[in-house]
């Protein structure tokens, strides 16, 4: 209901107006949250569960006394919708708003602060009035890198999520550029969606979903079909994708603590092979998932027999080295260095570990550290021609970097010198002008003093 519909007069308080004319927006229809639209918003889209929303608001008690206002702080209030970060009335009310809309909400205590209140400003069992302006809203950034944005259409059940290796059954609809390219029910193992033409972003998002949850996922190229695209679906390289996904059911995979050493070693051999298949196919993020399982299972495994310990160390060394190579391909050089460090912790003279750490550090412009690693490679294997070439590359890059720095600093100092000279010149000019004015004043004063006697009897 808009403010003009049935408004009595300008003198009636906003609280009374909402109480009499407001729309009941509660699911129970118990008049616990009443709403009047003061300014209609733009479009038809409203915020969804988990969206980050930006609002300005004023809050008053039923007697008209203001207890809070974002305007007084000169900054919007930001929260995630439907996550219990605000009072119930806000989660209900803001979910009905459109961008740019201003509304009035009247909230009964059970939808606000209840019998506890929020002392000292809000007493027990207080009915509250709010004026809210919805400035903006956007989906939940699942990994804080902009690669997967989730908008939840329907909240899931319970608190359990699928884990890596879980068996899931989902319904999905994929769109690109407004065209639907995929629509089906499918069952698969989380982390292995690629085997079913499902992008890695779906695997990642499923680990944050609950049973029966329905959401829209916006996938950047990194989490979609990447540089290769997907000719089967007519998807071009580096395309952005939109998927609507419903998690119908899932069965979690065994956690590490539920497996004995024998089972872990058996599974390590299986996932190592899967990881290698993904790596050879250019599916580096999928390969990371498989190699990462080996680390999660075996890195903290204790009390092994000599035979088990040897097998475990072999799997871990291979996993860290392969993870380092994956991270190099993914341009995550810091992670590549960390994995090499762990591999070298198991085998300090490992040629691949030293070489790959050198590669990562060279790409991070850590020329001296990289050169040191390549020199160690030659100590292990003097015949490694690639390492010798990389040492030359380190020296060349370091020289170029130093020369570039010298040019930058030289230009910087030149500008500073020119600026100082200009300021000195301006000071000198100002001083000269000042002296000229003083001399002129002095001359005029003398002339006046000389003329003064002549003007009097």
From Swiss-Prot:
Catalytic activities: [protein]-peptidylproline (omega=180) = [protein]-peptidylproline (omega=0)
Keyword Chaperone found: yes
Location within or outside the cell: Cytoplasm; Nucleus
Positions of post-translational N6-acetyllysine modification: 28, 155
Keywords of this entry: Acetylation, Chaperone, Cytoplasm, Isomerase, Nucleus, Phosphoprotein, Repeat, Rotamase, TPR repeat, Ubl conjugation
PPIase FKBP-type domain span: 42-130, 157-243
Record-linked SMART domains: TPR
GO biological process: chaperone-mediated protein folding; protein folding; response to alcohol; response to bacterium; response to cocaine
Changes after translation: Acetylation impairs ability to promote interaction between Akt/AKT1 and PHLPP1. Deacetylation by SIRT7 promotes interaction between Akt/AKT1 and PHLPP1, leading to suppress Akt/AKT1 activation. Ubiquitinated, leading to degradation in a proteasome-dependent manner. Deubiquitinated by USP49, leading to stabilization.
Region called Disordered, residue ranges: 1-24, 420-457
EC number: 5.2.1.8
Modified residues (Phosphoserine): 13, 445
Feature: compositional bias, Basic and acidic residues: 1-11
GO-annotated cellular components: cytoplasm; cytosol; extracellular exosome; membrane; nucleoplasm
EC main group: isomerase
Record GO terms (molecular function): FK506 binding; heat shock protein binding; peptidyl-prolyl cis-trans isomerase activity; protein-macromolecule adaptor activity
Per-repeat ranges for TPR: 268-301, 317-350, 351-384
Regulation: Inhibited by both FK506 and rapamycin.
Induction or repression: By androgen.
Residue ranges of coiled coil: none
PTM annotation (N-acetylmethionine): residues: 1
Tissue specificity remark: Widely expressed, enriched in testis compared to other tissues.
SUPFAM superfamilies given in the database record: FKBP-like, TPR-like
Oligomer status and interactors: Part of a heteromultimeric cytoplasmic complex with HSP90AA1, HSPA1A/HSPA1B and steroid receptors. Upon ligand binding dissociates from the complex and FKBP4 takes its place. Interacts with functionally mature heterooligomeric progesterone receptor complexes along with HSP90 and TEBP. Interacts with NR3C1. Interacts with Akt/AKT1 and PHLPP1; enhancing dephosphorylation and subsequent activation of Akt/AKT1. Interacts with IFI44L; this interaction modulates the kinase activity of IKBKB and IKBKE. Interacts with IKBKB and IKBKE.
Protein name according to UniProt: Peptidyl-prolyl cis-trans isomerase FKBP5
Source organism of this protein record: Homo sapiens (Human)
Recorded name of the encoding gene: FKBP5
């Amino acid at each position: 209901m808009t403010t003009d519909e049935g408004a009595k007069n300008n003198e009636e308080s906003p609280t009374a107006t909402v109480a009499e004319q407001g729309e009941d927006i509660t699911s129970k229809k118990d008049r616990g949250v009443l709403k009047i639209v003061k300014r209609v918003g733009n479009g038809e889209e409203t915020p969804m569960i988990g969206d980050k929303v930006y609002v300005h608001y004023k809050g008053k008690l039923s007697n008209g006394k203001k207890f809070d206002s974002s305007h007084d702080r000169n900054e919007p209030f930001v929260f995630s919708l439907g996550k219990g970060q605000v009072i119930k009335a806000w989660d209900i009310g803001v979910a009905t708003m459109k961008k740019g809309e201003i509304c009035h909400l009247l909230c009964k205590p059970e939808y606000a602060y209840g019998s506890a209140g929020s002392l000292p400003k809000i007493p027990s069992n207080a009915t509250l009035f709010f004026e809210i302006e919805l400035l903006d809203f956007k989906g939940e950034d699942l990994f804080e890198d902009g690669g997967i944005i989730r908008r939840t259409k329907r909240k899931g059940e319970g608190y359990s999520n699928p884990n890596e290796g879980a068996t899931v059954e989902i319904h999905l609809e994929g769109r690109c550029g407004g065209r639907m390219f995929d629509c089906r029910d499918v069952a698969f193992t989380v982390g292995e969606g690629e085997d079913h033409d499902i992008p890695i972003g779906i695997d990642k998002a499923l680990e944050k979903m609950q049973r029966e949850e329905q959401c829209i996922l916006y996938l950047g190229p990194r989490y979609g079909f990447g540089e290769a695209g997907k000719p089967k679906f007519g998807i071009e390289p580096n395309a952005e994708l939109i998927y609507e996904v419903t998690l119908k059911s899932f069965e979690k995979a065994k956690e590490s603590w539920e497996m004995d050493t024998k089972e872990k070693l058996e599974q390590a051999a299986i996932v190592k092979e899967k990881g290698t298949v993904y790596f050879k196919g250019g599916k580096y993020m999928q390969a990371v998932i498989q190699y990462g399982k080996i680390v999660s299972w075996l890195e903290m495994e204790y009390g092994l027999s000599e035979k088990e310990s040897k097998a475990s160390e072999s799997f871990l060394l291979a996993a860290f080295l392969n993870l380092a190579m994956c991270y190099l391909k993914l341009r995550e050089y810091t992670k590549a260095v960390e994995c090499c460090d762990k591999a070298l912790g198991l085998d300090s003279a490992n040629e691949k570990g030293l070489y790959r750490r050198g590669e990562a550090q060279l790409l991070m412009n850590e020329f001296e550290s990289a050169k040191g690693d390549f020199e160690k490679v030659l100590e292990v294997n003097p015949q490694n021609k690639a390492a010798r070439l990389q040492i030359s590359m380190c020296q060349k890059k370091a020289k170029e970097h130093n020369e570039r720095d010298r040019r930058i600093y030289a230009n910087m100092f030149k500008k500073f010198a020119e600026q100082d000279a200009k300021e000195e010149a301006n000071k000198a000019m100002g001083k000269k002008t000042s002296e000229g004015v003083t001399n002129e004043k002095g001359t005029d004063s003398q002339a006046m003093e000389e003329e003064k006697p002549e003007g009097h009897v």
